Amino acid sequence: MTALLKIGLVSVSDRASSGVYQDQGIPELQQWLEQALVDTFEVETRLIPDEQPLIEQTLKELVDEHHCHLVLTTGGTGPAKRDVTPDATLAVADREMPGFGEQMRQVSLHFVPTAILSRQVGVIRKNSLILNLPGQPKAIKETLEGVKDEQGKVLVKGIFSAVPYCLQLIDGIYIDTKPEVITSFRPKAARRENLEK
């Protein structure tokens, strides 16, 4: 349970991958993870176009070869024909985790009505959790942290509060978050102080 956390970050964008503009998804994810996680982690990053076979290959590589515990994708989750990230994610999945997609849409609907058009999914492949996040940096943070009022009180929980316990259940790795950013939830019996008894 003291293994180094490995995270794969995949930005899916035709234009960013071809140099039309600079990718903002991976830097936003890295910055947020550095602020939110207590644990040291290692990152594998990929910037790729909206091509389903390439997305599938990338997800398999990050899980099967690099042994990433968590893979976060950004972009390609809408209804447009080139938005195939969820399709690729489902194609490589062993099991679907529908609660993640449902909660991401719930959070995003507090900010934009078009969130209902999102097809984001969460899946398990082997011992890894793969989550599709929005493409916009602001929406990435909102989805991970949730909806907060002006005083910082959480009104709607973000998806990352469930990620540490999910990783613990599927792989055995124990990670924690900084409560000032997001509070991770796990049952009392699964908390570090009770595991070490």
For the regions a protein language model found, what residue spans apply to each?
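Non-catalytic beta/alpha edge segments that cap or flank active sites
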Residues: 1-197
